[in-house]
Amino acid sequence: MRRWLTSRLYDAFLVAAFLAAAPRIFYKVVFHGKYINSWKIRFGVEKPQVKGEGPLVWFHGASVGEVSLLEPLLKKWRQEFPDWRFVVTACSEAGVYTAQRLYAPLGATVFVLPLDLSCIINPVVRSLSPQVVIFSEGDCWLHFLMGAKKLGAKAFLINGKLSENSCKRFAFLKRLGRSYFAPLDLLVLQDKVYKQRFMQIGIPEDKIQISGNLKTFIETETSINNRSLWRKKLKLSPSDRLIVLGSMHPKDVEVWADVAQHFNKFSTKILWVPRHLEKLKEHARLLEKAGISFGLWSKEDSLLQYDSLIVDAMGILKDLYSAADLAFVGGTFDPLVGGHNLLEPLQKEVPLMFGPHIHSQSVLAELLRTKEVGVSVDKENLLEAVENLLEDEKKRQAYIERGKSFLKNAGTSFEHTWEILKSQIACIKI
């Protein structure tokens, strides 16, 4: 009875949230063309199909970052368990695009996650009948999880984390927090801080293991420095200094636009990479307002013509980082966002900068600051911090070396996570 009531209340909450967001969704559909290609699956009109026979593992991540970190895990699973079928879902269209690019060539079925209303997601879960469900970082959905468990599936959270704000909300509604995560068989978390937070909302300690942060993992074949290749592609001269501003939101653009023209004395080029392409016009308007002349990647404009380019393309941010002399991770000047993946620039051996709002990964950001791996900036010291790094190659190299050391020391996370999951897979009856 309690589970039925929880489910109905949860359905009611989702409907209310959807109605509240409906005007914004309508705006994105009409003016940006979003959700047009995915609405049939989102609303259960069209059911996804998985070809072939054999056991099925279903991976899920919210968006680009959560989906991308699954890559070494999925490749390893495919290598050691070739008879399994793979499904990868994401909530955002950017996440689905990334999953298709990374995992469709490996034979995975990729689609957007249907809405978690019981009448929509439950038939999909029953149809696919997964043996294993793996959630990336924390994007668990109650009906999806409960439906899979009813069918006897094992459910795991990997690279798990719980922000301080989420912990407070779940602690206030401790029964809901316990109900929300209790069906999980195992939570593989990033560190002890997140372990304490999950325990505060009622998750027993024997369901928790710590493996480290999967985003520190670098595959040998993908860790080759593509710096020369991409600098040549970008038409950069040896004397040019390139700043890559990744995953940018409008508030990040506002801050950087105020200082960008002060870097000309260093022969500086800037790539502005929006987090959401539907915000492209707003990004362009902010640069125009600041008097910054810029080109567009999609028009094949080059850094020979402009000192700034807006990269209105998906899936190339990591490659662009490899060409940079300095990288900034966006969302960190926007208190409503709280940052994105801080480790991508380090993986490409580039000095890292981020703003003051990093609550989405505050534990990692504090660790990076403490070990002097990343440079934390605010509006007041941004110009000075950038100029200091641009004019001092030795200082930039010192940050690169500390970043390499940090990743090397943290780089056992994937092996640990895989061994934990492998021990669980061995117990699954197929």
UniProtKB/Swiss-Prot annotation:
It is an enzyme of class 2 (transferase). It catalyses: lipid IVA (E. coli) + CMP-3-deoxy-beta-D-manno-octulosonate = alpha-Kdo-(2->6)-lipid IVA (E. coli) + CMP + H(+); alpha-Kdo-(2->6)-lipid IVA (E. coli) + CMP-3-deoxy-beta-D-manno-octulosonate = alpha-Kdo-(2->4)-alpha-Kdo-(2->6)-lipid IVA (E. coli) + CMP + H(+); alpha-Kdo-(2->4)-alpha-Kdo-(2->6)-lipid IVA (E. coli) + CMP-3-deoxy-beta-D-manno-octulosonate = alpha-Kdo-(2->8)-alpha-Kdo-(2->4)-alpha-Kdo-(2->6)-lipid IVA (E. coli) + CMP + H(+). This is 3-deoxy-D-manno-octulosonic acid transferase. It comes from Chlamydia muridarum (strain MoPn / Nigg). Keywords: Cell inner membrane, Cell membrane, Lipopolysaccharide biosynthesis, Membrane, Signal-anchor, Transferase, Transmembrane, Transmembrane helix. Involved in lipopolysaccharide (LPS) biosynthesis. Catalyzes the transfer of three 3-deoxy-D-manno-octulosonate (Kdo) residues from CMP-Kdo to lipid IV(A), the tetraacyldisaccharide-1,4'-bisphosphate precursor of lipid A. Thus generates the genus-specific LPS epitope of Chlamydia, composed of the trisaccharide alpha-Kdo-(2->8)-alpha-Kdo-(2->4)-alpha-Kdo. Pfam families: Glycos_transf_N. InterPro entries: Glycos_transf_N (IPR007507), Glycos_transf_N_sf (IPR038107), Kdotransferase (IPR039901). One of its GO terms (biological process) is lipid A biosynthetic process. Pathway: Bacterial outer membrane biogenesis; LPS core biosynthesis. Its EC number is 2.4.99.12, 2.4.99.13, 2.4.99.14. Its main location: membrane. Belongs to the glycosyltransferase group 1 family. Glycosyltransferase 30 subfamily. The gene is waaA. It is found in: Cell inner membrane.
